UniProtKB/Swiss-Prot annotation:
Cofactor needs: Mg(2+)
SUPFAM superfamilies associated with the record: Class II aaRS and biotin synthetases, tRNA-binding arm
GO molecular function: ATP binding; magnesium ion binding; phenylalanine-tRNA ligase activity; tRNA binding
GO BP term, pick one: phenylalanyl-tRNA aminoacylation
Protein name in UniProt: Phenylalanine--tRNA ligase alpha subunit
Binding, Mg(2+): 252
GO cellular component terms listed in the entry, alphabetical order: cytoplasm
Superkingdom of origin organism: Bacteria
E.C. designation(s): 6.1.1.20
Classification lineage: Bacteria, Pseudomonadati, Pseudomonadota, Gammaproteobacteria, Enterobacterales
Cofactor note: Binds 2 magnesium ions per tetramer.
PANTHER family: PHENYLALANINE--TRNA LIGASE, MITOCHONDRIAL, PHENYLALANYL-TRNA SYNTHETASE
Length: 327
């Protein structure tokens, strides 16, 4: 009891010297803890006469209260200083411009479709569209594709029933257009098509674009000239191009078109040919008066060749690291 004032003074000095909340808590334990200096003063009350104990206890409690108030005040100071330091470190410079929201970009396949539509639009072609759920007449029969052709098999085509299917080509758009209007006809038909195939260079759904001209005096020379100009415009270089004889039921003669790659090898890019007379007859156009040419190409294939992509499936995986390269 005799040195109570000294203990309070010592505690206040230690409190004022505490540099953080942890050090301050150590001071609290030293003086007010279960075995703290001031707490132990209560044990001296038993040495006093009973009538003096209440007054002495009140003095000890007052001393403890002074120390507790000093602890609370110092804790508030330390917490305020810590907050101010954190705010100073996190100060926002309001004069800095905000972070710009990153702009999106067109998918590389969409860029290819737009580029091709722009080129053929300048040649007078219009864009035609048609249903993706097609019937076997427009997808096969009208295109001179016989019933035994392997393209009709389940392993190549997605059938709903005996006559309804997911279109395997956009050629059905050509049939619908020729039935709806008389020549001259000059269209391109971009769109999604579906085939039962999946590997590094094939997916069950992909994009195709077909072109069609029907008019008088249309020749294979017109076809070659149009595709020569298109390929050199699309790849933006003076490519070596060759036409190889091929077979398609809906064109005669038919050809496949190759370009010379940077590795010195020929790369197939599209198929084409003169519209088969049977196809013209199927839509009520006289093949003795009119002729035409058609061509078809895969958009993913051309996009892969233009940008050097090796796996077609990358176009459908929505990986932003891949897609951002084409912005």
């Amino acid at each position: 009891m005799s040195h109570l004032a000294e203990l309070v003074a010592s505690a206040k000095a230690a409190i004022s010297q505490a540099s953080d909340v942890a050090a301050l808590d150590n001071v609290r334990v030293e003086y007010l803890g279960k075995k703290g200096h001031l707490t132990l003063q209560m044990t001296t009350l038993r040495e006093l006469p009973p009538e003096e104990r209440p007054a002495a206890g009140a003095v000890i409690n007052e001393a403890k209260e002074q120390v507790q108030q000093a602890l609370n005040a110092r804790k508030a100071e330390l917490e305020s200083a810590a907050l101010n330091a954190r705010l100073a470190a996190e100060t926002i410079d309001v004069s800095l411009p905000g972070r710009r929201i990153e702009n999106g970009g067109l998918h590389p396949v969409t860029r290819t479709i737009d580029r091709i539509e722009s080129f053929f639009g300048e040649l007078g072609f219009t864009v035609a569209t048609g249903p993706e759920i097609e019937d076997d007449y427009h997808n096969f029969d009208a295109l001179n594709i016989p019933g035994h052709h392997p393209a009709r098999a389940d392993h190549d085509t997605f059938w709903f029933d005996a006559t309804r299917l997911l279109r395997t080509q956009t050629s059905g758009v050509q049939i619908r257009t020729m039935k709806a209007q008389q020549p001259p006809i000059r269209i391109i038909a971009p769109g999604r098509v579906y085939r039962n195939d999946y590997d590094q260079t094939h997916t069950p759904m992909f994009h195709q674009m077909e072109g069609l001209i029907v008019d008088t005096n249309i020749s294979f020379t017109n076809l070659k000239g149009t595709l020569h100009d298109f390929l050199r415009n699309f790849f933006e270089e003076d490519l070596q191009i060759r036409f190889r004889p091929s077979y398609f039921p809906f064109t005669e003669p038919s050809a496949e078109v190759d370009v010379m790659g940077k590795n010195g090898k020929w790369l197939e890019v599209l198929g084409c040919g003169m519209v088969h007379p049977n196809v013209l007859r199927n839509v009520g156009i006289d093949p003795e008066v009119y002729s035409g040419f058609a061509f078809g190409m895969g958009m993913e294939r051309l996009t892969m060749l233009r940008y050097g992509v090796t796996d077609l499936r990358s176009f459908f995986e929505n990986d932003l690291r891949f897609l951002k390269q084409f912005k």
